[in-house]
Amino acid sequence: EQFTQVMNINTWANKVILDWLLTGNIQVKQIIAISTGTGVSTSKGWGAYSLSKLALNKLLTLYADEFPDTHFTALAPGLVDTAMQAYLCDENRVSVDDFPSIQKMRDAKETNNMPSAQDAAHAIINAVPRLMEIPSGSYTDMRNL
């Protein structure tokens, strides 16, 4: 049930929105979907989340071929200080044994390596023009721009 919920939120909800935008009478020049590094490199404990983001990445690759007038990017914002990160960094809730890569997040918490959601949003907005320079349907990471 948890796997289905993760897929519904991270993949299918995006598909519903994309289909509505792309099949309506709206000209959409650019679509940016928020992805994650775990969608391209797997790690113990991240199964459903990784698979849901991988599916989202591939959906954008497919749509880039099907809708050539729209530019698609799967964008990983990097570590962002959100409620999800707070939950994952809580040692009483999430074990490093279950999620070995979680220590990297815990080390980044409250540092410049994990900006606030507002700071991350500003960085994404500033990156929008540069995203048009990479091939449509590509995955990219904010930290590599």
Predicted regions and their residues:
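Catalytic Tyr-X3-Lys loop
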Residues: 1-15, 56
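Conserved mid-core segment of classical short-chain dehydrogenase/reductases
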Residues: 1-4, 23, 45
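Rossmann-fold scaffold of SDR-type NAD(P)-dependent oxidoreductases
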Residues: 10, 33, 73
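Conserved internal alpha-helix within the Rossmann fold of NAD(P)-dependent oxidoreductases
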Residues: 10-18, 30, 40, 124
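Hydrophobic positions on the long internal alpha-helix
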Residues: 13-21, 25, 59-60
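Alpha-helical segment proximal to the catalytic Tyr-Lys
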Residues: 23, 65-66
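Catalytic loop of short-chain dehydrogenase/reductase
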Residues: 28-65, 76-80, 86-89
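C-terminal helical subdomain
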Residues: 74-75, 82, 93-145
